[in-house]
From Swiss-Prot:
Summary of the function given for this chain in its UniProt record: Core subunit of the mitochondrial membrane respiratory chain NADH dehydrogenase (Complex I) that is believed to belong to the minimal assembly required for catalysis. Complex I functions in the transfer of electrons from NADH to the respiratory chain. The immediate electron acceptor for the enzyme is believed to be ubiquinone.
TM annotation in the entry: 12-32, 50-70, 92-112, 113-133, 153-173, 176-196, 218-240, 249-269, 274-294, 300-320, 343-363, 378-400, 427-447, 464-484, 500-520, 560-580
Family to which the UniProt record says this protein belongs: Belongs to the complex I subunit 5 family.
Subcellular location: Mitochondrion inner membrane
Enzyme Commission number, as recorded: 7.1.1.2
Membrane topology: Multi-pass membrane protein
Record GO biological process: ATP synthesis coupled electron transport; electron transport coupled proton transport
Cellular component, GO annotation: mitochondrial inner membrane
Keywords associated with the record: Electron transport, Membrane, Mitochondrion, Mitochondrion inner membrane, NAD, Respiratory chain, Translocase, Transmembrane, Transmembrane helix, Transport, Ubiquinone
The protein, known as: NADH-ubiquinone oxidoreductase chain 5
Amino acid sequence: MNYLVNYCKNSFYILIFISFTLFILSLKFLLMDLVYFIEWEIVSLHSMSIVMTFLFDWMSLMFMSFVLLISSLVIFYSDQYMGEDYNVNRFILLVLMFVMSMMMLIISPNLISILLGWDGLGLVSYCLVIYFQNVKSYNAGMLTALSNRIGDVALLLAIAWMLNYGSWNYIFYLDMMKNNFEMMVIGGLVMLAAMTKSAQIPFSSWLPAAMAAPTPVSALVHSSTLVTAGVYLLIRFNILLDNSKLGQFLLLVSGLTMFMAGLGANFEFDLKKIIALSTLSQLGLMMSILSIGYYKLAFFHLLTHALFKALLFMCAGVIIHNTKNAQDIRFMGGLSMSMPLTCSCFNIANLALCGMPFLAGFYSKDLILETVMLSYMNFFSFFLFFFSTGLTVCYSFRLVYYSMTGDFNSTTLNMLNDKGWTMSFSIFFLMVMAIIGGSMLSWLMFFNPEMICLPYYLKNLTLMVCLLGGFTGYLISNVNFFFINKSLVYYNFSFFSGSMWFMPLISTVGVVKWPLILGMYSYKMFDQGWSEYFGGQMLYNQLKIYSLYVQEFQNNNLKIYLLSYMLWVIILVSMMLFLN
């Protein structure tokens, strides 16, 4: 056991050291406006050479530092959370492979090497989702893998299409792609790949299903790695989205995703799925602001979101760990009395998610919403942005109401405490980052900020939407004296919203059902029907008839021999006469 513990600790120390080093480097690159291209010649044979290119700028270095910081804390946290697991060694290796795939994707300016990291993320995520090896995990892993395969195919098609340029280093050809309609196909394929990885409609169903993975994986996957890979890829291709049809389409899809996830989280009772739907909502927000053209804002929110979302998942993991793997929030309640540190960190992460002033989420979300108010867009897009923000506060309040207030609703055979210092250290470190991370990043990334001039009522609109969302969360959560839950009055609407607009059903049964039925009819009608009648059975009958004729010839019948002799004589005489 000590060997495994040291394995976790060593990984933690190495990753956190590299993370701080990369962060300092990213500040230097940002202040001095540096970009490094490093070419590594892998094979050189006569006139042929295979060269791998790496791109280092402030954005890639800062993103890598955040990924490694969260990965190191997740591995440290797993030391206790997965401590009793027999295969913890394998688990840590899978997490490290996952992080390496993400590193490959971040520093690649080349579609081929991006595909290596992209596929690595997909394959290792499958191994992590099925880690617990039960039927639910296998189904979730298959849904995750197959959804991401669509994005892999789109990237492969983009690679094939880029053969027109003679190089796969897309970074040099973005302006050319923007001006050439035929090459905008590459932008469309890359956008499709990003939509599958970042779980936008209609590929949203895999993200809550992936909650079958261990909680440390959820903290890593849903904060800074797998789901943000699509957003990061589109940040690199941001020129193609600016003032284009692709950007308008992405704005519609991501806005609907944001709204759907926020609405669904208000009708969900699984603790991890609520946080997963919250992630989906924030991904929709990032994609939306990216489609308008503010890629730096999308990157800023990506980093701040990584901090408080990892903290949310880690706190949820501590709660699940202490309540003997119970995830239904209706069986919780009163946790703040027994787990004060965890609940404090959980509430800080929730407030950061809602956009509470001076926490990490406030600096990015408030800036995004004020920028949206300055942008030219129709009322529908405007409504999606602000209504989804209100829904975020609504489900956050509901989550706290169910899990942390009132009386404990589960069995009494639970040891609720905050005594695990390993998990407590990880969540406390992330809590500090969730408090100071937003202000620190806003000072570093926007050292020449633009002034946003808005009327008084628009300036306070974001705050009013948040307060209204919190009040609505209280109303739909509160059970009155006659025990009529407000969220169950309109059952059909609740069922529709709670099932993510039937997205999981459409993605699984909807895709498979009709091809299976058509395949069965084809098998019955053709394989066992006409093709059997005209193929196997008829061939057998014809051969049987011909074999009977042959048997007649073999009976040594004198009449048949004379007849055949006369027939051949007639044929020969006729041929001789015809030739003469």
